[in-house]
Amino acid sequence: MTRKIFITICLVTLFSVIASAGDNNSNTPLRFSKEGKFKIVQFTDVHWIAGNPASDIAGERMNEVLDAENPDLVIYTGDLVFGAPAKEGYMKALEPVLKRKLPFAVTFGNHDDESGMSREELLALLKSLPGNLSTSTAGLSGVPHYALTIA
């Protein structure tokens, strides 16, 4: 009887892992090219401030990088926006990827939720945008918290 319980637990665990992996970005558009290549552009600590001319310059640089690199994925790693209004800042900071219809993912830094929106509200905003791959996985702490699969 102990062996049956052990096998049952193993099977339930295996199927749970498979199911949870399938739930997270199961319709991901991330694929290696036929040549086996996948290009990622990373922007970090953009500190976008809505209405600040320096932020407009940062937007120009992001456009230049995206035009030059033509990435398969863009990742923003923390402190994308610095200062309220957060929604306006996020929409302007993400404009380069949104207008190109590129898939993107965001992780939050220590300043992102200091702009008048909580991390949960920011994630809800991101989830409403086309191309966003940011999400949170049930049962894991942190917002957002996820893994992306490249096939």
Ranges and model annotations:
Residues 24, 91-151:
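Extended active-site neighborhood of metal-dependent phosphoesterases/phosphodiesterases
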Residues 8-16:
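Bacterial N-terminal signal peptides
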Residues 1-5:
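Positively charged n-region of N-terminal signal peptides that target proteins for export
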